[in-house]
């Protein structure tokens, strides 16, 4: 195996420019699932994925999953891409998952470069929307197959593939498909590998064994039939924006403390054993400062910082739709405003209970305002938290592969973000799920100037190659 891997590493380095060009083509497709006008681009990205894998000999198909309501209209959901590479009954079979949609991005948001043009700086940082989340890892799998074909090395496992275009907008339709195909298309899977997380910091690789869940809500406050002149009507009517700000100010304190009654009662108790795990993780407050670009930490030490990032819930305010947000001054009273916020959930929180508690709190606060405006509460989407065991044989495979590529034992960590499909795969297939990151903790997924370091991209491809060879040799 060592000789084969060394040759694979050499060809990956040799084909670096080709692999970067492929990633550049992927980034150039603005596959923003949250923008109805860009939905055709999400479909275009699905076609790109199908084409690239098909060229390498994979059997690919697109599954239509119907329509959904978006911006008041019925919109086709992007197809889910399924694929199979190899069907040798003597080999292990791994199901890989990635997503090909991305978060919204524009120069007006503050990007230093065009977000849909992959730009490489003199430090080897590749900037572009989706570079790390999640087009880089997806292109990494394509490149791993190509490296094997280039050398005529037999791919050591069978690959099943599941790629979606709605991950950044709630993964609508995916859960039903996975459950329907658990004993059909996905029946031969021995394990599942997802590459949609990141290192904790910038220097040491990790394997992720836990994720927080998410419940995303919006509150709509509506009053007049149209926007009003504040000089004419200010002080004479109940203003929707004032009501909304009053409600949102009761959700969370500036120090992160959630103010909604009952939320913290659901959280699993921190045991001494779990508490001690955080002592050995390679992370500093300087890592946090570097990742966020400012010294704005709530807690003074890494231990409490990581605990509140991974194992405690958080509530974040995301924005207000319908309010004036342009440059200059506009003295308008908005007729309708929509406040958006989410709660990251942890063991043992249940989404249904969280929704009930939030709705009760929001309704109670609104009623106390004695406003004549109208309130509407909506749960936009929810996904459960997930915890696995780092002692599973599959995680040992990931550990050995990481050690081979990086020369260091990875930290086993949890992640503050959410990948609801992880729970669905584990529950439906009854197979272990490994989260195998490619990018670093400062990549800025979902933020402006999202990037993926060239070194992580190339070593990530090598990691995928090593992972499948280690997987082929293990006896569970």
Curated annotation (Swiss-Prot):
SUPFAM superfamilies: Zn-dependent exopeptidases (SSF53187). Pfam families: M20_dimer (PF07687), Peptidase_M20 (PF01546). Gene3D superfamilies: 3.30.70.360, Zn peptidases (3.40.630.10). GO terms for cellular component: cytosol; nucleus. It is found in: Cytoplasm. Its main location: cytoplasm. Its cofactor is Zn(2+); Mn(2+). Signal peptide: none annotated. Its EC number is 3.4.13.-. Keywords: Cytoplasm, Dipeptidase, Hydrolase, Manganese, Metal-binding, Metalloprotease, Protease, Zinc. Zn(2+) 1 binds at residues 133, 168, 446. GO terms for biological process: glutathione catabolic process; proteolysis. GO terms for molecular function: metal ion binding; metallodipeptidase activity; peptidase activity. Coiled coil: none annotated. Zn(2+) 2 binds at residues 99, 133, 196. The active site is at 101, 167 (proton acceptor). Belongs to the peptidase M20A family. Catalytic component of the GSH degradosomal complex involved in the degradation of glutathione (GSH) and other peptides containing a gamma-glu-X bond. Has a Gly-Cys dipeptidase activity. Homodimer. Component of the GSH degradosomal complex. This is Cys-Gly metallodipeptidase dug1. It comes from Schizosaccharomyces pombe (strain 972 / ATCC 24843) (Fission yeast).
């Amino acid at each position: 195996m060592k000789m084969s891997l060394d040759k694979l590493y050499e060809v990956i380095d040799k084909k670096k420019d080709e692999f970067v060009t492929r990633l550049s083509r992927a980034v150039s497709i603005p596959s923003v699932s949250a923008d109805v006008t860009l939905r055709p681009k999400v479909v275009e990205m699905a076609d790109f994925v199908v084409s690239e894998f098909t060229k390498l000999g994979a059997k690919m198909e697109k599954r239509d999953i119907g329509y959904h309501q978006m911006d008041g209209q019925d919109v086709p959901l992007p197809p889910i891409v399924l694929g199979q590479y190899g069907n040798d009954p003597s080999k292990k079979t791994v199901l890989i998952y990635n997503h090909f949609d991305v978060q919204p991005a524009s120069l007006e948001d503050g990007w230093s470069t065009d977000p849909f043009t992959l730009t490489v700086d003199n430090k080897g940082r590749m900037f572009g929307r989706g570079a790390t989340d999640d087009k880089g890892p997806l292109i990494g799998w394509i490149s791993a197959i190509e490296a094997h074909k280039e050398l005529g090395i037999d791919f050591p496992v069978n690959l099943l593939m599941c790629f979606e275009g709605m991950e950044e907008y709630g993964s609508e339709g995916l859960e039903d498909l996975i459950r329907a195909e658990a004993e059909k298309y996905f029946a031969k899977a021995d394990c599942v590998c997802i590459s949609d997380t990141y290192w904790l910091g910038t220097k040491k690789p990790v394997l992720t064994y836990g994720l927080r869940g998410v419940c995303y809500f919006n509150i709509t406050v509506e009053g007049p039939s149209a926007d009003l002149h504040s000089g004419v009507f200010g002080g004479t009517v109940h203003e929707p924006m004032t009501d909304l700000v009053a409600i949102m100010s009761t959700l969370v304190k500036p120090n992160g403390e959630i103010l909604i009654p009952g939320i913290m009662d659901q959280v699993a108790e921190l045991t001494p054993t779990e508490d001690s795990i955080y002592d050995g993780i390679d992370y500093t407050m300087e890592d946090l400062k570097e990742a966020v670009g400012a010294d704005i930490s709530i807690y003074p030490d890494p231990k409490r910082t990581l605990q509140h990032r991974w194992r405690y819930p958080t509530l974040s305010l995301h924005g207000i739709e319908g309010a004036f947000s342009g440059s200059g001054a506009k003295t308008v009273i908005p007729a309708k405003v929509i406040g958006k916020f989410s709660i990251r959930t942890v063991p043992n929180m249940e989404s249904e209970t969280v929704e009930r508690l939030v709705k009760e709190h929001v309704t109670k606060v609104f009623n106390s305002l004695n406003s004549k405006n109208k309130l509407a509460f909506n749960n936009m989407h929810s996904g459960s938290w997930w915890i696995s065991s780092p002692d599973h044989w599959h995680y040992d495979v990931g550990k050995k592969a990481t050690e081979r590529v990086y020369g260091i034992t990875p930290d086993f960590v949890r992640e503050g973000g959410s990948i609801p499909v992880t729970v669905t795969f584990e529950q439906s297939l009854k197979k272990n799920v490994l989260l195998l990151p490619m990018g670093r903790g400062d990549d800025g997924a979902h933020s402006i100037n999202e990037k993926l370091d060239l070194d992580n991209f190339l070593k990530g491809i090598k990691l995928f190659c090593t992972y499948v060879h280690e997987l082929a040799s293990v006896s569970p």
